[in-house]
Amino acid sequence: MSGNTFGTLFTVTTFGESHGPAIGCVIDGCPPGMVLSEVDIQPELDRRKPGTSRHVTQRQESDTVEILSGVYQGKTTGTPIALLIRNEDQRSKDYGNITETFRPGHADYTYWHKYGIRDPRGGGRSSARLTAPVVGAGAIAKKWLFEKYGTTFKGCMSQLGDIEIPFEDWRHVTENPFFSANASILPQLEAYMDDLRKNGDSCGARIDVVAENVPVGLGEPIYDKLDAEIAFALMGINAVKGVEIGAGFKSVAQKGTEHGDELTPEGFATNHSGGILGGISTGQNITASIAIKPTSSIRTARHSIDKAGNPVMVETLGRHDPCVGIRATPIAESMLALVLMDHALRHRAQCGDVVVTPPPIPGSR
């Protein structure tokens, strides 16, 4: 396999390039009989699409999704579901100056040495544009998980560059382009991004995601641990350089008396584990965070080399997100949903008949 397919029972294969005619995915393993149309998918794509504020790329894409297969009379058939999103606003001429050079921090150099050929237009296959079909597939997973278990997903930006964003309330997330759960800090975030753009620079971000009402028992005990699969999936998002589950790296400074989530008849007392123990879901909220590096394509000239190994200065002229993390929240939610969907089907296949008494205790949120 060449790494274009994700999942075991619920699989997603993406295709396309940033400046090709279209991008999309083929989803296999979706159970039959679920009511599904483009209306169920489009709102998630609209959360991610470019051109929604001055702080993201100004490439104008409607990201209108088309369902090509796998749905009949408004319901899934159990056969592969193909989603297509047509590219509408490519401007390939902006990349003429980097066809023979490598952008520092980008996949140009590694794609060239791996394949011996690369598509420089918008980064080709390595572009974050390819996260759109992932969000489309994630919308299907979210719908099935909600209808089956009541599982829901939410996320927010908790840090932009060196600015930490204290959590206030989830209701703020839908009210601003940063997916910030803090309304009072928005002027500071806007000023920071305006300054970055003016100086031709970029920054990173931290995104937190949560899955609620996750059933107990998802995940495998050794090599396909649920937290390992979540980390694998989240690391597959463009520009992600770090993943935390639950308390994550804060666990290093915690004592065992603090980190271990105590159990009572009324439920778990805390949730430092992030809702996963021994690679298997506890029924608590699953919590994860990702660290996203600064965007590699910037207008400031940087030292690099060309294909012949000669020193050059590289300046990227295309339309780019000065912070990829601003639009990453729905992407991270979708990847988490895809993992849980896959493991829900795997758990149902092997352990669907298992009955344990007493029932699971409530989880600390």
From Swiss-Prot:
- One Gene Ontology biological process: amino acid biosynthetic process
Kindly indicate whether the keyword NADP belongs to this entry: yes
The main enzyme category here is lyase
Give its E.C. classification number.
4.2.3.5
Sites binding FMN sit at 125-127, 238-239, 278, 293-297, 319
* Cofactor annotation remark: Reduced FMN (FMNH(2)).
Q: Which PROSITE patterns match?
A: CHORISMATE_SYNTHASE_1, CHORISMATE_SYNTHASE_2, CHORISMATE_SYNTHASE_3
Amino acids binding NADP(+): 48, 54
Assembly with partners or alone = Homotetramer.
The Swiss-Prot or TrEMBL record describes its family as follows: Belongs to the chorismate synthase family.
Please give the function described in this protein's UniProt entry.
Answer: This reaction introduces a second double bond into the aromatic ring system.
Protein name, as recorded: Chorismate synthase
Q: Which organism is it from?
A: Janthinobacterium sp. (strain Marseille)
